[in-house]
Amino acid sequence: MIGVYLRSVIFPLLFVIQTICQPPGNVFHLGFLHCDVLENNVEGSTTYINYRTSASAASIAIDKIKREGLLLGYDFKFTILYDQCDENIAAGNAIKLFAEHNVDVLFGPTTNNAAMPVFILATYYNIPLITWGITSSATLDDESRFPTAGMLSIGSRSLAVTFREVMKEYGWDQFVFAYSLEMNDEKCETLRDDFQNMVAYYGDIVLSYAVQIMDHSEEGLLAILKDVSTRGRIIVPCFHEGNSRGLHRRWMLVAARNGFVNDEYVYIFPSLRSRGYAVPQADGTFRYPWTEATGPQPGDQEALLGFQKSIFIVDMQGQGNVGSNYTQFEHEIIQRMKEPPYNCTDACASPEYQTAATYAGQLHDSVYIYGVVMDQIMKTVPNQYKNGTAFPRKMAGVFNGVGGTVAIDEGGGLQPTLFVLTLDSNNNSSLIMTVDVDQQEAVVTKHYTNEATALWSHRKGIRPPDQPICGYTGSLCPANVFFQYIGWFIAAIIIIFFTIMGAILAFIYLCHAKQQEVERQNALWQIPFKSMMTVTKKGKGEHSMRSISSVPSTISSTRSSTLSEVGETRNYLFFQIQNDVEMERVAAKKHSIRMVFDNKTCATMRQMRLIDHANLNKFIGMSLDAPQLYSVWRFCSRGSLADVIRKASMQMDGFFIYSLMKDIINGLTWIHESSHEFHGMLTSKNCLLNDRWQLKITDFGLRIFRTHDQYNKSDRLWTSPELLRTDDILGSREGDIYSFGIISAELITRSSVFDLENRKEDAEEIIYMLKKGGLQSPRPSLEHDESIEINPALLHLVRDCWTERPSERPDIKQVASQLRSMNTNRNDNLMDHVFNVLESYASTLEDEVAERMKELVEEKKKSDVLLYRMLPRQVADKLKLGQTVEPETFDIVTLFFSDVVSFTTLAGKCTPLQVVNLLNGLYTIFDGIIEQHDVYKVETIGDGYFVASGVPRRNGNEHTRNIASMSINFVKSLADFSIPHLPGEKIKIRVGFHCGSVVAGVVGLTMPRYCLFGDAVNTASRMESNSKPGQIHLSEEANQMLMRLGGFTTEPRGEVIIKGKGVMATYWLLKMDESAAPKILKKKQD
């Protein structure tokens, strides 16, 4: 009853799925022929092509077509019928689809039996047909007979071509073929015919024997093995791949138990429905072919010995084993079968329907490719959309299928990639080669470096021949001559022994030398952090070189002024390292990853350091012991291209822009043609300029760090839309071309990327619009200054580089060729061009420089005059030369202090401005007097006046004479001094001086002062504070100095209590003889 209900209600033979009602002219009618195991229990269809585990792949493909903006304005209508893998049902339902439902295209059938009549009918109705699944017959691949058919399934002819490539690769010329026609499966018969056709077509290998297996018991298989063993050693068994897959195990078990598994025999299993050594189960899991589905059995290990001598040729790509998104695709198929329009819930709930069909990906790719091709047809020749004869030729190309790249030839047939597998030494499936098949031709890609270990690990590393060494009867081996020539054999063995020993020793020496060379090269790129000298700048935190506690500068004597101006950035630090000749300036890029450098990574570092290209920045090495991981690159003094554009410090003409673009292309050409393949993160920030205006690309090759580095949103503005959508941080060649276009726009417009400063959108909004794509996808403006001559072809080239579709962008060779064609009859040397530009400004600049120099000299004179008034000349001269002014001790000097008597009372009678004018007039008189003496005015504080002699210029014992003479002149000068606003008031001063030792030095960075320190300063100040108005008070030491000099009259004051000193004997200076006047008068400090 359940079966009747399912047949009559849930799965009628015909139902129509119409997605969205659209006008008839805008709806494509898609027809499908599926095989449903409930109606006809076709063995294997559950695993490979069952409707319940594959049909929704078409809807997923339609979603992808719409996401990619294909066939805009069109909808799709589905009509699904079941052929039940039967040719009669298939023919009848095909006529219904073509004649009654008037479908525009037919997808299916999925088996060889059902396909033949449908192919004929599609040709008759001239309707496009795309088949998928397990249709493998080479007959269906006849373009002349079936011109309307495109095939995404792999034909057995591709297996035959791949098999021939395996035979040729390992030097085998002959093989035997044993096949079974169990379950009436045409697979092996078709394969036999294709093998025979392949042998006849090429003529370079021989099918020695072909035999059909009639008896599948162990006895029958043993008889076949004995038969074929007399005809060949390369044995190709072929069995049905449905529920009878146990024949593979039974065959190998019989071979192992009866002596047909040894180093002579090779068993090659060609299969399109197999995954090699992974046998799929109904629940989606896998088992090994040497085991039973029911679990471990006796004989599993014996069967394993047989499979160790085997090779599988399989279609892994067609079954979705290539591509990281395939697991999600399989899960989505099962989920969407439960949703409208399929609504397969109860009927699809069984465990065997919880895993997607093996070839569901082919159905998805068939519908998707139809959408891509039809989009092109509707844009070019819309009246040909239903022309079946023309359709297969339009399918030619490469498409991004759900399981990986799908290549279609000119006839609409799949260009498959077949996988050749064997068991490695650990009995794990190992891919040894892939074969890309195109019609009768093939391209072989080996996936091993050592054939002995990769293929023959179970054969002692020896490749087996295709026939016994001595022939099948042993007649090919000569008689044993060992004993006849035993002496020669012994001599040969000795020679060989010593030769081998010599070779071993030479090999050991070479290995040791190679290891030493590797270690030497590793030492070159491993840069110790302690050898990297940081370049510092003088700042607020540094001690003054002019203070009394000055110490030698901490600034490196080898620092570069250019480096010191750069400083640390978010991504870079700047250092100097010692190379073979001199200190070299470097930039260290910060990486936020810590990792162990294995041999492969070390080899990459060695290769990176050997790169020396005119337009690639030199990679110096890595600093592994730094606080964080640094990659070290040569420093380019002019900074990045982005910096040059932002600062607008260089006037760029058309040739200058062209030269920089050419440098970028030269660097990218090398990268694209090298093992690095592409840059991946090309921006104007990592296009650097050296002092010769030569552009060098940096930050290339170290892709291992890029996935862990931190990037701002603005750093992604140069990334192509397709990479932004996938969050691919590594990049591609096409992405580099896009980035080059964006950088070129910056150069042409001399503005930042996307002119962010003048746009209303920020970086994140622009990236969102780039990801979204479409007709409104933003691109930089190419409007440039009309004074700059830009070749219009250059603007077209830039627009081609940033086109939305990667496939439509020119490759690096095309870009380089077009750039060369734009620079005819011009010198390619940018430096010569820059020099020519500079020469045109030379005369004007010389005059301007001379004028500026004259102004500079005048300003310097004024500055020197001001400086000499603030500091002693000899001190100022040292500071101007950048020399350190060390604190200095003076054993004997004379120190003078004075202040105005009752200054506070006097100031109270004046306004602040009058006080300033009063002191300015008084000090102007005093300054004129000190100019006549060998003294130095230390400072004035309010009404206090501090003068010293004997410092900083030593003058023997004349310092006391100069201070005494100056003091007397100070007192005398006040007799004629009057206060303009207080004519009745008279100024009187108190004077005191003392002789003693002091320490002198420069203090401070801002307004530095030449200061004196010591007890003598305090004593001199006390002489002044204890003096009387109009009197000159001096200490006993000063009095003794005057008495030794002579010419001065003093009188004792007596003992006076001095604060901080106790009782001191002091004196008054009364007068000075003219003969005692200082000999050094009106002398400037020198």
From Swiss-Prot:
Segments in the Extracellular topological domain: 22-487
Catalytic reaction list: GTP = 3',5'-cyclic GMP + diphosphate
Main subcellular localisation: membrane
Domain Guanylate cyclase: 894-1024
A cellular component term, taken from the record's GO annotations: plasma membrane
Distribution of this protein across tissues and organs: Expressed in both ASEL and ASER neurons throughout late embryonic and early larval stages. In adults, expressed asymmetrically in ASE left (ASEL) sensory neuron.
Limits of the Protein kinase domain: 560-836
InterPro entries (UniProt xref): A/G_cyclase, A/G_cyclase_CS, ANF_lig-bd_rcpt, Cyclic_nucleotide_synthase, HNOB_dom_associated, Kinase-like_dom_sf, Nucleotide_cyclase, Peripla_BP_I
Family: Belongs to the adenylyl cyclase class-4/guanylyl cyclase family.
Annotated protein name in UniProt: Receptor-type guanylate cyclase gcy-6
Gene designation per UniProt: gcy-6
